[in-house]
Amino acid sequence: MGLFNAHAVAQQRADRIATLLQSFADGQLDTAVGEAPAPGYERLYDSLRALQRQLREQRAELQQVESLEAGLAEMSRQHEAGWIDQTIPAERLEGRAARIAKGVNELVAAHIAVKMKVVSVVTAYGQGNFEPLMDRLPGKKAQITEAIDGVRERLRGAAEATSAQLATAAYNARIKSALDNVSANVMIADNDLNIIYMNRTVSEMLGRAEADIRKQLPNFDAGRLMGANIDVFHKNPAHQRHLLANLTGVHKAELNLGGRRFSLDVVPVFNDANERLGSAVQWTDRTEEHRAEQEVSQLVQAAAAGDFSKRVEEAGKEGFFLRLAKDLNSLVDTADRGLRDVSRMLGALAQGDLTQRIEADYQGTFGQLKDFSNDTAQSLSRMLGQIREAADTINTAASEIASGNAELSARTEQQASSLEETASSMEELTSTVKLNAENARQANSLAANASEVATQGGTVVQKVVSTMSSINESARKIADIIGVIDGIAFQTNILALNAAVEAARAGEQGRGFAVVAGEVRTLAQRSAAAAKEIKTLISDSVDKVENGNTLVAQAGQTMSDIVVAIRRVTDIMSEIAAASAEQSTGIEEVNSAVSQMDDMTQQNAALVEEAAAAAEAMQEQAGLLNQSVAVFRLDTPPSVVQLASARPSAPRPSAPAPLARSGMARASKARKEDGWEEF
């Protein structure tokens, strides 16, 4: 009877423990564990309380994951709206959620996706599986791992201690039932590494992966794993056997089988006597998770290299991974479209095309980048348009200046040519006037001699007959000289007329020259009149000489008349000599004025040449500026700028007929030798 009561009490206590575990499995973590019902159960109940605390912490961590999902969704929406500097508030998260948020934030900082490692235990906790082994956490979090390990050890020890009792059997049955129904993939092996337990989830998982595992392990059969050795998962199991034999804590491993990637959390199982009973393994199929990690990693690496064409494959994903893929793709797509638009516009600017604009609708930082880029292109287009119009204006002005300089150069050349011809004519006129003065001086001397002879004629009248022939010859010579003087006066008159014409052509500058030419003409006319009078007198003298032989008797009576006439001739010849001297002085002054005008014309020609060179240089610079600006395409064609001349250019006067004088030819040759070919 006492034994029966003991079994009943043990059964009741086992039921209590199983009820607590079932409530934990159902998510009822606020159920009070209570105190140990009897000595020996303290460690077990302490472990249950530690397990309850651990599960509460796991639930809190699940809430952190939900906060992470909310932050990621908000970041995705903000990125879709263009605010690419939005990040997940990692400072509000803890543990793995904070690390994932930090990785995503690094992706956001570089406008790329960040590699995000999603741990399989988070998914298992979300599904209500409380059996997976915890990672070896640092710092104070290591107490959580130790508490869970202690629970596993004490549960196994309690099961072995009560294996002979019905309560223990019931307890084990309930434990097994709980493990069978949890979502975690649990496998237990004994010390010989033979598989002694597999829950339904791990069997189903390995069954789904059987075809892939056989690619690497052809003899693998998921339906015959119970009782088999775990060596079936390894081609060379010696290393794994040694590792498990010396295992004292949680061991994490990654197993790749036929393209499948499994995460293994292995923990040794001890009884209350600290005897090794075997090992428990939590399997997690991380194939999809690993594939997602690889895709995110490739996306990050491509974006870091400037390639935004990569995307995370959305097909075949669901839940969190699907949302993550969509959000990352949306993020990269927004960055890609924005950078492509900016690249297209900058490429067009580099090619000189200022008509390109960013038309797509962006917000946030990309919106500002769009506005700044469009404003920059608009400002450049407006500035280059103004430069192009200014260059056209300068080019037109330079062309008109060059044209005006060409006309001015031609006129200056004609003026220089006329002045050179005038100078040549004045040289000849000066030479003629000097010759005329010399002849007048000689005539004056002859007239003086004739007067002296006439004065002595009274005393030598007896010699008149003998010298009549000589007088007749002298009279003929005088007549010839007077003819020459008459011709000189006529030529002087013609030259004075030509000088007046040239002075009229010179305009205002030739006014003084015209006055001098008029005086010369007056003197020439007076010389001509005097020459005519002398010619008349000489003709009369010749007639008288011819009649001298018959009038010798009358010579004495008319001698006084001859003396008076000869004195008159002497006076006239003196006047002719004085007029010739004045004429020579006037011609020299005219020649000096013409020389000064020629010098001024040459200086003007030099200034015109410099102005023409400056205008050509300005026109050339304007052309270069037009060529530089012409490579740019603007929104609107530049307006044509024309400068109206201040006055219509005067027609170029026809060049005067060249004078056939050797002096003109010599002057022209001298100009060419001095480098004045343009004038």
Swiss-Prot record:
Reported effect, residue 264 to D/G/N/P/R/S/W: Signal-off receptor that does not respond to the addition or removal of O(2)
Keyword Repeat attributed: yes
Stretches with biased composition (Basic and acidic residues): 670-679
Sequence motif: DxT. Important for signal propagation, positions: 285-287
Segments for region (Divergent domain HAMP 1): 8-56
Segments of skewed composition (Polar residues): 411-425
GO cellular component terms given for this protein: cytoplasm; plasma membrane
Recorded consequence of changing residue 283 to A/C/G/H/K/P/Q/R/S/T/Y: Signal-off mutant that does not respond to the addition or removal of O(2)
One term of GO molecular function: identical protein binding
Protein name, per record: Methyl-accepting chemotaxis protein McpB
Species classification: Bacteria, Pseudomonadati, Pseudomonadota, Gammaproteobacteria, Pseudomonadales
